[in-house]
Amino acid sequence: MTTLLSAERVTFAYPQDGRGLQPTSLQLDEGQALFIGGESGCGKSTLARCLTGMIPHLYHGKMSGRVWLAGQCTDQTPLWKLSDLAGLVFQNPAAQMLSPTVEEEIIFGLENLGLSPTEIRRRVDDTLARFDLERLSLRSPQTLSGGEQQKLALAAITARNPALLILDEPLSMLDTSAAFDLVALLSRRTTEGGAVVICEHRQEYLKDFPNLQTIVLDGAHSELANESGVDWLTQESTEIRLEAENLSVERGGHTILNDWSFHLLGGQVTAIVGRNGVGKTTLLRVLAGLQPYSGELAVHANNRLERPQLGIVFQNPDLQLFNPSVREEILYHIDQPDIARYNSLLAILDLKRYEQVPPLLLSEGEKRRVALATVLMRCPQHGVLLDEPALGLDAFHKYLLLRLLEALAAAGQVVVFSTHDIELAAQANRLLLLGPQGIVASGPPQQLLMQDSIWEHLGLRIPDWVRPLC
């Protein structure tokens, strides 16, 4: 059996803060798969970069140890040669989108292999069909949802057919059906002789994966969060009811939302669930006042009608982080900051040790926690909206997130998050289920999760490990 990947006591430290990867060794042969786990910020993404040769070729820092791809030492082999052997899908797929259309994104990698136009066309058509991207082939990648971008990044890499796939959180932005489909596709690749490395927090999706090895990276262990600090975040409770009537959004000639009507209550944590591309992000942007729409949107509070004043945490935190340190990011343009509130946010979100670190150097999960802290530091009047807040979070930090959202709701605020993590959604007070034609159902998770017909209508699978939670 041929060894495709091996690493011998590989370490790496970034120059800005010295964080990175502790000594790690591994070996992967043809037909095998490797799961890499560990808490947020332990170095999974750094290891993925080391295994593909992006470290040391593209990232500065101190590396020791050696990595071999198909017998070639990565620090002595040009990156363009290594890219023929291994493909990497980033944790943030938007960071690897280069082309003006979905189809051209796939074509770009194939042209760099020097394939004939006939072979390129065959692979493009096959890949678009396999990843259910045919209807999006002429769309700009930048207009896709996060899940659709993740599918496109996977499609573009697999179309090149490298012997080794290295995937950084490949399931994080996918709906449950798409996640199971991807696991099946990766499983077939290993049975056909390929190899796969999967860095993930959602290991439960891989429980039946054939020939799967597992390593768990050590990292800087999280400090015990000071949950009593949640009290600082609460405000005087008022009755808040957000009413939406006949909301519609059109963008680029496409109807995204069509005559949607619903309400949201303060005092509840509401989870929005639906397939990739159904309109979850667009809906949150409308509620935050960032997306033009037609229809009526108002908040009933303090016995009067008000315009919604809601903070929002984007699915891609890079879009709202730009300061040189976490401290400066959270306190940005606040004239007289409430330092007690600031310190509580650091404790609750486990960010104290990163206070002087540039936010964009953090892991994806850590960046999301910083983005949430920046929003909550500004005390949004009516509540907070979070787009896929659990991406990149381990179980401990998901617990902290839920504890915080529950405290905000207990203060009477509107708290809404979108998610593909059904296990997380099951712990909300209310589910809002979205389909292509609008809102399919709304109610307590314990009721909706037991109604198979609704989920079949949505085209979503309920993972078997979620049912016991109900």
Ranges and model annotations:
Residues 66-81, 290, 296-312:
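ABC ATPase NBD Q-loop/coupling interface
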Residues 118-136, 339-354, 373-376:
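Conserved ABC ATPase "signature" region
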Residues 140-144, 148, 358-362, 366:
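Conserved ABC ATPase signature
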Residues 175, 387, 394:
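ABC-family nucleotide-binding domains
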